[in-house]
């Protein structure tokens, strides 16, 4: 593991310095996914490996692009975004997994978030709860275009963000289970597509920093389909979501260059 703790030019957590990352960053949660995503870049180089944060930098169509893992949840994701921003990044694409909430959101589908329910704690330390967690329109459109280009089954809409994974999957065992179940049912009635753990924080932090952020996910499974006895295989291969994220960054590079 690289250790730059004595270098004041490097960000404390991600251990990256200015000039080592591109303006475009793909952000998986799982550090192990960084290698997989970096393989889609030209000439990827390992920049840093510290805690849950691994960073690679390469190029797409001749433009510097980076991949940085965030770990699980809003606190570490917000740290990664803050420190990457200080190193020059301004466009962030979160890629990860989610659980479907609507019965038509099936295992293996792609979900692209337009906004996120702020049922987590990190964003509340950035903005009052009345402020919406909304994805950047340019990034969202690039993700949708990429999913269409790949002909992948995809859904676009609101996702729910929480801090407790097992609060979602075993609410009846929680002292706050009554509230968790009632809110879950409310989110379903409102058409929420899926549940995950980072987007609300990233969207609000991006708003505070004045940068662009969007999210796309692989649907691993759908507990609502399970409850109804519907087909619900577990799908763990994130390659389709990775392809969407990489193609979306290509779309953004092309659009940004055309607008200069």
What is the role of each PLM region?
Residues 1-142:
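Metabolite-binding pocket within alpha/beta catalytic cores that recognizes anionic/polar moieties
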Residues 29-32, 72-79, 87, 105, ...:
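Conserved active-site and cofactor/substrate-binding residues in soluble primary-metabolism enzymes
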Residues 44-49, 151-158, 254-260:
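Flexible, glycine/charged-enriched surface loops at secondary-structure junctions
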Residues 90-91, 193, 212:
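Short acidic/polar active-site loop segments enriched in Thr and Asp
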Residues 133-191:
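Active-site rim beta-loop-alpha module in soluble metabolic enzymes
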Residues 142-150, 205, 244-255:
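Generic non-transmembrane alpha-helical segments
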Residues 200-233:
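Zn-dependent metallopeptidase/amidohydrolase metal-coordination segment
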Residues 223-260:
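His/Asp/Glu-rich mid-to-C-terminal helical/loop segments that flank catalytic regions of hydrolases
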């Amino acid at each position: 593991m690289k250790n730059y703790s004595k270098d004041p030019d490097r960000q404390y957590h991600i251990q990256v310095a200015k000039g080592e990352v591109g303006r475009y960053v793909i952000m998986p949660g799982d550090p192990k996914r960084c290698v997989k995503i970096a393989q889609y870049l030209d000439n990827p180089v390992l920049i840093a490996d510290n805690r849950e944060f691994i960073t690679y930098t390469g190029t797409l169509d001749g433009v510097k692009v980076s991949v940085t893992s965030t770990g699980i949840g809003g606190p570490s994701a917000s740290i990664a975004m803050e420190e990457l921003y200080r190193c020059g990044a301004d466009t962030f694409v979160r890629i990860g997994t989610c659980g479907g909430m609507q019965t038509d959101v099936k295992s293996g589908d792609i979900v692209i978030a337009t906004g996120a329910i702020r049922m987590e704690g990190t964003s509340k330390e950035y903005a009052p709860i009345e402020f919406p967690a909304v994805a950047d329109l340019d990034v969202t459109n690039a993700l949708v275009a990429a999913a269409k280009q790949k002909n992948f089954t995809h859904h676009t809409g609101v996702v729910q963000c929480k801090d407790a994974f097992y609060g979602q999957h075993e609410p009846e065992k929680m002292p706050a289970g009554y509230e968790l179940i009632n809110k879950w049912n409310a989110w379903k009635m409102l058409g929420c597509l899926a549940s995950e753990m980072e987007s609300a924080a990233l969207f609000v932090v991006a708003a505070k920093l004045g940068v662009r952020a969007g999210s796309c996910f692989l649907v691993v499974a759908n507990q609502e389909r399970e409850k109804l006895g519907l087909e619900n295989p577990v799908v763990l291969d994130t390659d389709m979501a990775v392809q969407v994220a990489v193609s979306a960054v290509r779309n953004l590079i092309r659009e940004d260059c055309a607008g200069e």
